[in-house]
Amino acid sequence: MAKKVAVIGAGVSGLISLKCCVDEGLEPTCFERTEDIGGLWRFKENVEDGRASIYKSVITNTSKEMSCFSDFPMPEDFPNFLHNSKLLEYFRLFAKKFDLLKYIQFQTTVLTVKKHPDFSSSGQWEVVTQSDGKEQSAVFDAVMVCSGHHILPHIPLKSFPGIERFKGQYFHSRQYKHPAGFEGKRILVIGIGNSASDIASELSKNAAQVFISTRNGSWVMSRISEDGYPWDMVFHTRFKSMLRNILPRTVSKWMMEQQLNRWFNHANYSLEPKNKYLMKEPILNDDLPSRILYGAVKVKSRVTQLTETSALFEDGTVEEDIDVIVFATGYTFSFPFLEESLVKIEHNMVSLYKYMFPPQLEKPTLTCMGLIQPLGSIFPTVELQARWATRVFKGLCHLPSEKTMMEDIIKRNEKRIDLFGESQSQIVQTNYVDYLDELALEIGAKPDLISFLLKDPELAVKLCFGPCNSYQYRLVGPGQWEGARRAILTQKQRILKPLKTRSVKAAPNLSASFLMKILALVAVFVAFFSQLYGF
């Protein structure tokens, strides 16, 4: 008899978890509290309690080739960076292709998830749900928590003395939908993440003045990288990831700083991070530098005091006649249907093995999906999480002892703090390619570059120097997809398809490029084995 799996939420994590359950012969049931799929990426005009919320203009920060699921490329005519409505269209195509809707119970709220009385032997869970005012209870062999972590807003009002006297309007960024109604206002945006920079840039086109307040500053990247290709297609390659791991951090950070400052000098724009040697996630925003250059956005330091109409900043400056304050200060993790002891978040550390499994459970039958912030696309990340989790549920993959898992959690957290800092916003941040490979290794889906170099040099070059996207994890191991090789070799066509809307004479192709990459790949392996064996 197939094991029954409860999937909580029908957003991105929920949809891919459903598919992975079906792929492994499990029997999933998904509980979705709203009337439709899409989660965070389904825009609604009104903010709803208990549901993620986005503004109407949201565009993906990761490109389509780096964001698609591993055996379902996005249509080639889709733009490289997608408006939220276009991304939702892709999820609908995905759900239809793999017939996932039949597993979803819509407008059903999960009230509680508790261990079954015989959990220590069965690993089962009792899930209580509510629909149409009626409660139901069912027993499941495993649970995948896919409810997201952009729901409960974090508004640290105590950190802003005088907020109670402020006479203007203030709200969290999750309540922002569009710029209508803010024309001619003087607006203060607190925070400097992606949402803060998006909202500040958008509002500045019609507001009287926008200020953006930051404690530490931030690097800003454009979605457009070398030769006009999407940034993540250039940044996330195995070769560059290996270099970043091998080189001393001062060297790799210096190289990254030079690259980021090539677009504009961050110090001149008052954006340079205080601790620029931490590898915090940069902002992806194509408009912010221009809006600062136009004077429409002004960067300010930390707010120390608010009055009825003004804001005092750490550097002693004051801005008067503030009409609106937008708190783009992130979110707090919340899983109200789970016992607090299951997902522990203490001392800025999430006590989950590889950001997924509670280590203290006698049976590894509950996992949190997507509770991670990779320096890359979340979609391939959560897909590999789901592929691994479902194989653990099925007994095909095994977890180490609780002691070993706790040691890994502590060590991983120490490394995270060393790389990214102790900020609340970096609590689940991780390196992208390293984490994908780590999960792929668990299920036997990590490609062996040496093997491919010997039998398929053309593909090996793409694997090493090309974008590290999800197709790579369908070449070997369980769940192989026969279209993976072709998807890797033809991804450039899908990148250029929506751009080539006018006939232009093609530039000559440098035939030496392929040979140079082959030689470089061989040199990399020679250097690696020389170091390994002391040649």
Swiss-Prot record:
Molecular functions per Gene Ontology: flavin adenine dinucleotide binding; N,N-dimethylaniline monooxygenase activity; NADP binding
EC number: 1.14.13.-
GO CC terms of this entry: endoplasmic reticulum membrane; membrane
Classification lineage: Eukaryota, Metazoa, Chordata, Craniata, Vertebrata
Function (record text): Catalyzes the oxidative metabolism of numerous xenobiotics, including mainly therapeutic drugs and insecticides that contain a soft nucleophile, most commonly nitrogen and sulfur and participates to their bioactivation.
UniProt entry keywords in alphabetical sequence: Acetylation, Endoplasmic reticulum, FAD, Flavoprotein, Isopeptide bond, Magnesium, Membrane, Microsome, Monooxygenase, NADP, Oxidoreductase, Transmembrane, Transmembrane helix, Ubl conjugation
Name this protein carries in UniProt: Dimethylaniline monooxygenase [N-oxide-forming] 2
Sequence positions that bind FAD: 9-13, 32, 40-41, 61-62
Localization, UniProt: Microsome membrane; Endoplasmic reticulum membrane
Cofactor names: FAD; Mg(2+)
Acetylation listed as a keyword: yes
Xref: Pfam families: FMO-like
Organism encoding this protein: Cavia porcellus
Enzymatic class: oxidoreductase
Protein family: Belongs to the FMO family.
Membrane topology of this protein: Single-pass membrane protein
Tissues in which the protein is found: Lung.
UniProt key word Secreted: no
Modified-residue entries (N-acetylalanine), positions: 2
Transmembrane segments: 510-530
Top-level taxon of origin: Eukaryota
Residues annotated as binding NADP(+): 60-61, 195-198
Cross-link (Glycyl lysine isopeptide (Lys-Gly) (interchain with G-Cter in SUMO)): 492
Chief location bin: membrane
